[in-house]
Structure formats: C-alpha cells, structure tokens
Amino acid sequence: QRRNWVPAFHKLSDFMQNADSIGGRGNGRLRLSNYVKYGIFEEGDIRNSNFNIRRTIYCNKQPKADKATIGINANGYWENDESKVVKKITIGLGDKVYCHEADTLNVMYPHTTKWGAYDPTDDFGYAMVKDIPLMRFAEAYLLRAEARFRQGNSQGAADDINVLRDRAFKDYRQIAPGAGKVSASDISIDFILDERIRELVGEENRRFTLMRTGQLANRVNMMVTKWAEKSENKRISGFDANKHILLPIPLTEIQLNKDAKLEQNPGYEVDDK
C-alpha cells in the first residue's frame, strides 16, 4: 500500500536516491485526480503544502558531470530530442528535478506524502507494508458535520469543519485573518465530501464514502466531464451507473447460501443455462 502512493523516483537514478525524505522506494501505482491537485484547495491551506502534497522534487544525489546538464522543452520537461530543446540547465544537489513528459505517469507527479516509509536496511522497500490508519480524530468531526447537515443543522456542521480548518489555516491566518473559515451557507454534501478529500486523501476508502452518500455516479461524471486527464490511460472510462454503483457478490457466497436464493446485484447476473 505505501509503495503504491509514492512515485517511482528511483527511475531518475542520475539525480535521485532512495531516502526517508522522499518516502522511500515507491512504485507509483496510485495517483491523485486533477480535481484533487488543482480544484479543491484554498490559498494558505497547509494540507496542500509541499510537505503534504509534494509537487516539487529536489535532487538528493550529486549527479555525475556528464549527466548533470539536460535539455528542457517548451512544456518545461526534460527533453532528449535536441530539435525540441528550448534551453539547457545544469542540475546539482538540492536543485529542482525535471522528468520526461512520459514519466509523469508513475515517476514524478503531485502525490500525498502520507505513505512515505524508508528503512536503510531494506533499500528496495519490501517492508513498506505497515499499519494503516482506520480512523483518526479529524474524521469524527467530519462524520458529525455530515450528520448535523442531514439533520438540518448547517451551523453545527460548519462549526465542526472549522475545528479542522483552525489547524489547517493557522499559519496563514497570521497574514490573512479569517482565511479558510466557513459558515452555514457554505455547507452542502458536496462541500463535506470535498473537505473529506482535503483532510483524508489517501486514507479513507473513497469509493465506499461515495457509495454511502449516494454520490458515486455524480462524482465519476464530474471527473469525466470537467477534470479528465489528457492521456487516455489516466482517464475513467466504462462506468455504468446502472451497474457499477454496487460490486458483484462472489459466486462462492451465492452458492453457500443454502436456505434462500441470494440474488446477484444488477448487471452481474450469470445465465445458468
């Protein structure tokens, strides 16, 4: 689980080496959506700082002299094709690291730092499967905020969310008093779901939350129509709201249910004939 959330920085071996400061040796199999990266955070929210969602990576390995200078293309990526290079830069220890455009899939991209782990005696990262949070205090406030909203108590919901935001905007409020504070008029189920992202991204099972609140189809549609990735292999496709809201019941469970017929969920039925 931990390695899935951490990009595969080790593939940039000229400039990067495994270390605790970058989350160890990840394999980059889980990504934040465009909505999370660009659509939900306000200025000054520490939950979006580079310490929590890392967007800039710095060289932690002194590159060899013949590897330190690279070409950069018009889009700001490392480019090997000289015809597309618009400038040359030399990277040293502590400088910003650049990657090829193709590497944004799993090597370098904005990511949550919650899952980083590194053991110098296990450089490859075999032991990065560790305890995971099931629930923490912040989620108790978010659940109560949702319950209060459903009871018609939007002010109570705002009060609960503001407890979290008093922490998230504490430093920024020194220059912008009141930053991040919400009122009853701000509260909706969409706002609460967004606040759950801001607070719990990478921790909760998001699909279950969206199923529980009846918002899975709406959120998938929003991702497809407004926040879709440019690359086909990064997009959501094939979602059918008539089928995919629920998951299939395993055939073994249906067969073991002897006293009554256990109906398969719609869309997953198998013809017995």
Language model segments and positions:
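Short, surface-exposed recognition loops and adjoining beta-strand edges that mediate ligand/DNA contacts
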Residues: 1-12, 171-187, 191, 208, ...
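Acidic/serine-rich, low-complexity amphipathic helices located in mid- to C-terminal regulatory regions
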Residues: 1, 185-224
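Short, contiguous acidic/charged loop-to-helix segments that flank catalytic cores in large enzymes
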Residues: 124-134, 147-150, 178-184
